[in-house]
Structure formats: C-alpha cells, structure tokens
C-alpha cells in the first residue's frame, strides 16, 4: 500500500529514507513519528535502520541500493559503515565507492535487475554497480535530465517518471527496465519524484503533500494492493470525490 509521511514538516521524504526489498534506511534525527511510519509498515518483514551517511541526513540522495547490496560514497565514516553493516542482513553486500558525482542517489537508480546511471558516471563505478548490485547498467537521461536518480523511481513491478518524459522515451525506458512506466508527479505536482517518495515491491511512502489522485496512480503503477491500471479511473474518481467533500 501507499502511505504518506513527512520528515520534520518536510515532504521530500525520498531524501531522508532508502527503501529496498531487504532493508530500509531512515535518517537519524527527525521526529520519532517519521521512523514509526516505516516501522509500522515494514518491521514484520525487513529491518528498519536509523543511519547517517558521510555525516548527512539526506541518506536517500547519498546512496544507491537494492536487495543484493548498498553503495555509499567514499566519505562515509568507518563508524557509519560498521553500523549499517551490523544492521543489514548478511546477504546484503556494502561497498564504499570513490566517485566524483558523490550523491549516488541523484545520479543512479535501480531495481533488483536493472540500473540507470548518469551519462558521465565513472566506468569503474559502473562496474562496481553491476558487480555489487547484480544489475545490468544503462547510461540514460530521463526527460533530457541527467540526474536519473532524481527524476524517476522504479521497482520490480513498475515505475514513475518525470511528467515531461515523451512517449518515445517512456517506451525506450520501459523496454530497458522491463516494467510498465507512467509519467507523473508526487507532492502535489513535484517533478522531482525520487525526492518525494520511496518504494519497494509491496509498499510505497510518499510525501505528506501528495494528493489522493497521485497516490492512486502510485498504487496502481507499482501494483500495490494488487491495483491494476484499469482501476485507476475508478479509484481516481473516488479519491477526487474524497478530496472535494
């Protein structure tokens, strides 16, 4: 299902959390409320871990990961690395990466099989990505934006891309990723999708400003609650009526 949350009144929750099918990292600090939203939905299935990366709370923008592994920038401290290692399942490989574009979450995005990366990403980083996360890597742009990690979010079920992505680009990306894609927004019209939401194969968290229409699109394209695209129209109608009453 899709749940709304905010971090210290900030709706850009994708900056403060990293969610995969085997673990969830949540920024330290913030209200206990933010952590408990994730804990409530996920704690039965995967570990929810308080963390910071390179002294920053914007962990969602600093790292990239999937069920196989997690890559963090080179300036992550030993203490932070050790804490994350101890908290995640043993099957998850964790690696530091020396990369000029150090906000890895902005320049890369992936599910458990495929990764999209910034066209200028180091060749070595690309190899580490393929090796640690066990993914096929493609250098791509989304709606002519090089920050692929900011403007699209996808799971193994589906994906949401920048609202100005052309139909041709959507088709190309969809065939690379092998999942259905929809162009859309979160947080009442925000184009920076990855900053406003996190998702895995069964659960999504969106910023508090996300409208019920946006939420129903998210639930449908990511196949949460077994929602199918055909149900978008009916659930949208219901949610529009909800928001108008």
Swiss-Prot record:
Membrane-traversing stretches: none
SUPFAM superfamilies linked: Pentein
In-chain residues carrying the UniProt-annotated modification Phosphoserine: 166, 174-175, 235, 239, 243
Residue(s) carrying Phosphothreonine: 165
CDD domains from the UniProt entry: IF6
Residues modified to Phosphotyrosine: 113
UniProt-listed GO biological process terms: assembly of large subunit precursor of preribosome; cytosolic ribosome assembly; maturation of 5.8S rRNA; maturation of LSU-rRNA; miRNA-mediated gene silencing by inhibition of translation; miRNA-mediated post-transcriptional gene silencing; positive regulation of translation; regulation of fatty acid biosynthetic process
Main location: cytoplasm
Keyword Cytoplasm: yes
UniProt KW keywords: Cytoplasm, Initiation factor, Nucleus, Phosphoprotein, Protein biosynthesis, Ribosome biogenesis, Ubl conjugation
InterPro entries tied to this protein: eIF6 (IPR002769)
Gene Ontology molecular-function annotations: ribosomal large subunit binding; ribosome binding; translation initiation factor activity
Subcellular location: Cytoplasm; Nucleus, Nucleolus
SMART domains referenced in this protein's UniProt entry, alphabetically: eIF6 (SM00654)
Free-text tissue specificity from the UniProt record: Expressed at very high levels in colon carcinoma with lower levels in normal colon and ileum and lowest levels in kidney and muscle (at protein level).
One of the Pfam families matching this protein, by short name: eIF-6
NCBIfam families, alphabetized: eIF-6
PANTHER family from the UniProt entry: TRANSLATION INITIATION FACTOR 6 (PTHR10784)
Family indicated by similarity: Belongs to the eIF-6 family.
Quaternary organization: Monomer. Associates with the 60S ribosomal subunit. Interacts with RACK1. Interacts with DICER1, AGO2, TARBP2, MOV10 and RPL7A; they form a large RNA-induced silencing complex (RISC).
Name this protein carries in UniProt: Eukaryotic translation initiation factor 6
Organism: Homo sapiens (Human)
């Amino acid at each position: 299902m899709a749940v709304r949350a905010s971090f210290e009144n900030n709706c850009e929750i994708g900056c403060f959390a990293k969610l995969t099918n085997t673990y969830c990292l949540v920024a330290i600090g913030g209200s206990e409320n933010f952590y408990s939203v994730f804990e409530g939905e996920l704690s039965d299935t995967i570990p929810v871990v308080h963390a910071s990366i390179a002294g920053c709370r914007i962990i969602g923008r600093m790292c990239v990961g999937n069920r196989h592994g997690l890559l963090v920038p080179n300036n992550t401290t030993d203490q932070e690395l050790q804490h994350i290692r101890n908290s995640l399942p043993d099957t998850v490989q964790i690696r530091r990466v020396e990369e000029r574009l150090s906000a890895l979450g902005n320049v890369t995005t992936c599910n458990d099989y495929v990764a999209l990366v910034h066209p200028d990403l180091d060749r070595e980083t690309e190899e580490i990505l393929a090796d640690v996360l066990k993914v096929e890597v493609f250098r791509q742009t989304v709606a002519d934006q090089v920050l692929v990690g900011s403007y699209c979010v996808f799971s193994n079920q589906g994906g949401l891309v920048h609202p100005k992505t052309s139909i041709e680009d959507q088709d190309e990306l969809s065939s690379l990723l092998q999942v259905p894609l929809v162009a859309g927004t979160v947080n009442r019209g925000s184009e920076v999708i990855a900053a406003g939401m996190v998702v895995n194969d069964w659960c999504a968290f969106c910023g508090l400003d996300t409208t019920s229409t946006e939420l129903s699109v998210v639930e449908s394209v990511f196949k949460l609650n077994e929602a199918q695209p055909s149900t978008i129209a009916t659930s949208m109608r219901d949610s529009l009526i909800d928001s108008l009453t």
